[in-house]
Amino acid sequence: MARAVSRCPWPPVDDPIYLKYHDEEWGVPVHDDRTIFEFLVLEAFQAGLSWRTVLYKRPAFRQAFASFDARRVARFGARDIHRLLRNAGIIRNRQKVVAAINNANRFLEVQQEFGTFAKYMWSWVGHRPVRHRWRTLRDYPPYTEDAVAWAKDLKRRGFSFLGPTVVYAHMQAVGMVNDHTVDCFRYRVLARGIPIRNTRRDRGRGGEATGR
């Protein structure tokens, strides 16, 4: 009899797309700028909605946003905005569409300054993943001090729709933090060679801790 796989408590066991994301992507360190930009776009669009909604619309987002090529997205104009707002395959929110285009331009500025966005991004955790030891869904904070500090710098640089909660979700997604629960099989895979770091959690005002 096959032994049941132990996972984090948040991915629905009857949702193959969600499980695939948890098992193969979430928390894996990302150093590729295009993939980083993809997650920044998706995280900003997810704000206020479920991540499941974004996952199921991800292929449509990829097509609508030029395969997440920041240089191409940065050149989007009024006609592109109109096109995106008529695209039923994505989340049609004008503010978020405009924010994605703005963020593409800011993304390019960071690349120009640091060489790659990844180099800038990873500097916020000392260029190596932070390994937490969450045991239950209640342990997850909505954001940490690192997320607050980075969100503040992103705002200073002109990024939008990237507050501390969204930024922390991004940090979890791209592996800046290993936030799989300690009993999850992915925690052990991703934790190899990474020391545990005690991180001060900031639950904000009435924030409710969640995983993904």
Predicted features by range, described:
Residues 1-212:
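HhH-family (HhH-GPD) DNA N-glycosylase catalytic core used in base-excision repair
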